[in-house]
Amino acid sequence: MVIKQGDIFYVDFNPSKGHEQKHRRPALALSHSLLTKFIGLTIVAPITTTSRNFPTYHELTSTRTIQGKVMLDQTIALDLAARGVSKVEERLSQEELKLILDKYKLLFDMED
């Protein structure tokens, strides 16, 4: 199964350390599927149901079953096949995916 950019699925983030996200939770694929094809890794962002509002969080609006906030400050490259991901739960709208990717890119802007 090929996970595509904008797909939401469940993945186990363990093992993790410190402030890294833990346990099985929904995640959003941020990277293009070509990355997965060539190196076997997918850049993902975990989704949380926390009530906290951080500038690096994006509250989902175009999903039906998966609710929560995409944690853009917790992205990680994972081998989804090795972690047993076998089902896509939902897919974001193109409009919402663009908003998220634009916000993600801001994390890498040059500092003055």
Feature-to-residue mapping (PLM):
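C-terminal terminal-subdomain/extension
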Residues: 1, 64-112
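Short, charged beta-turn/beta-strand-edge "cap" motif at the junction between a beta-strand
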Residues: 14-18
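Compact nucleic-acid interaction/catalytic patches
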Residues: 22-24, 28-62
